[in-house]
Regions:
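Glycine/proline-enriched, intrinsically flexible loops and inter-domain linkers
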Residues: 1-504
């Protein structure tokens, strides 16, 4: 079944699903339920790799063994102080332990804490025409490594599109962006391309065109652009888009969903593009990925997302929103499914690009430029009017229910019906023994300084990247403080990006 349906879940996950439907629901699951679970529990949506339990950690002998051991022991001490033995050891815990430690010691009091975690949000004071206001400043980054390898233009354009929508769901206006990518040697002859892969030069140029096209159309200043060249990126491309957004705190409310509240879908229509995107990016590439996975890459439409940005900058609209989510990986099943414990979703209400979509496709399609907002039912007409003023569609697709179950209807039939408790298990958690090996040096530290300098100067990483950087508009919005290049000849790359907040 895993191979036939191309599932991302493990055999242990399938047995977990089988046991639940046999013992609790006492029926066979539908194909839509299987696909929804495969999507909802995918590595892309639930970070299953980073949440894998780590055990039996060993550090191999080598010149860096003591350094690695000290770093590991530092983590163990922080972990003991922050949460003792209450949590298992994971890569996610290692990545976040520093922030948790600082927060415990009162050094992150400006961090906004809420159920909505689509972006890192901090509270700041902002000078607006001489008057100090409370604002929320939000940071987010997104990777689109898998789709950019398959379809460079579309993968990179939807990378920045998805990155924008995360702070947008927090009701902030995204005004600044950074792009950091990794590629192999783009100067190699096409004949040397790895089998079943696109040439590195094609990926690099196509991705730069896609990201810059989307960002320039939507009106986002991209002020830091850097591509890193290393043979390690031949096996897996790196495509990272990072954004900064901000909004007056008074325009943002965070409230719990209540039975009778509704979920409104706003933005673009739904098609087959992006079906299987979350699960596809959670699986290994093989010799058929290049030819069979292009439909998993969404088709971006920047002008629609620009309208969404304008709508979310309208305080009349944002003050009606209790909770919001963007339609990224997983489509309806995740964007709507995460907003409340109990939901009745009507897939027939989802606007479509063309006729013929099945209930499964409507449930997991990742068509872009869509947002889900949770509002009170009495606010719908006023909210829809705000959307219409930006030439955006707005329709009710779900209602919050008392019973904690995710239910979906299509053409009068119930095609998904499962408990929130089961859905939130996120499948079967992986367990992994760990052996830390020492990496290889990319240069001889004992070679003469002159030869090391000359060797570095031959590498593409020290070459000027102004040609690529100038594809990206760095001045739109009039808030840029540091331009990408400076110095006497305007050829020295800036090491940071800085911009003023987008106050009106």
């Amino acid at each position: 079944l895993r191979v036939k349906e191309g599932l991302a879940m493990t055999l242990a996950d399938l047995k977990h699903v089988q046991k639940y439907f046999r013992d609790e629901e006492q029926r066979d699951l539908t194909m839509t339920e299987l696909k929804v679970l495969d999507t909802y529990w995918s590595d892309h949506c639930r970070h299953t790799t980073f949440e894998t339990i780590l055990q039996n950690v060993t550090i191999k002998a080598g010149e860096l063994q003591e350094t690695i051991q000290r770093a590991y022991e530092t983590y163990l001490k922080l972990r003991e102080e922050v949460h003792g033995n209450r949590k298992v050891m994971t890569l996610m815990d290692m990545a976040t332990i520093g922030g948790k430690y600082l927060r415990k010691h009162g050094k992150l009091d400006d961090l906004e804490i809420s159920d909505e975690i689509n972006a890192c949000s901090i509270e700041v004071k902002v000078d607006v025409d001489g008057k100090e206001e409370d604002w929320l400043l939000m940071f987010k980054n997104e990777t689109h490594n898998h789709p950019t390898e398959i379809e460079p233009f579309g993968g990179a354009s939807t990378c920045i599109g998805g990155a924008i929508r995360d702070p947008l769901s927090g009701r902030s206006y995204v005004y600044q962006a950074m792009r950091i990518t990794g590629a192999g040697d783009i100067t190699k002859d096409i004949s040397e391309t790895m089998e079943h892969k696109l040439p590195q030069s094609r990926i690099s140029k196509g991705a730069a065109a896609g990201y810059s096209s989307y960002g320039n159309q939507i009106g986002l200043a991209t002020t830091y652009v850097k591509e890193i060249y290393d043979e390690g990126y031949v096996a897996k491309r790196m495509e990272v888009g990072a954004v900064v957004g901000a909004a007056p705190k008074a325009n943002v409310k965070r409230e719990k969903p209540c039975p009778g509240d509704i979920v409104v879908l706003i933005g673009g229509a739904t098609g087959r593009d992006g079906v299987g995107g979350a699960t596809g990016s959670s699986k290994e590439h093989n010799d058929t990925s290049l030819t069979k996975c292009s439909s998993e890459v969404q088709k971006g439409n920047a002008p629609i997302e620009r309208k969404l940005q304008r709508l979310f900058r309208n305080p009349k609209a944002t003050r009606m929103i209790k909770k919001a989510n963007d339609f990224g990986a997983g489509g309806v099943s995740v964007a709507v499914g995460e907003l409340a414990d109990g939901l009745n979703i009507n897939l027939d209400s989802v606007p479509v690009k063309y006729a013929g979509l099945s209930g499964t496709e409507l449930a997991i399609s990742e068509s872009q430029e869509r947002m889900a907002v949770l509002i009170e039912k009495n606010d719908f007409e006023a909210f829809r009017q705000c959307a219409y003023e930006e030439n955006l569609d707005a329709c009710i697709v779900a209602e919050v229910t008392e019973e904690p179950r995710l239910v979906m209807y299509f053409q009068g039939e119930k095609i998904v019906d499962m408990s929130r408790a089961f859905l939130d298990t996120n499948g079967v958690r992986g367990v992994q023994d760990v052996e830390i090996a020492e990496g290889e040096r990319d240069h001889d530290p004992f070679a003469p300084v002159s030869s090391n300098i000359l060797d570095n100067l031959r590498k593409p990483n020290v070459a000027c990247q102004i040609g690529m950087a100038e594809m990206f508009d760095a001045s739109i919005g009039k808030s840029t403080v540091l331009m990408p290049f400076g110095g006497k000849n305007q050829l020295t790359p800036a090491q940071v990006m800085a911009a003023k907040l987008p106050v009106l």
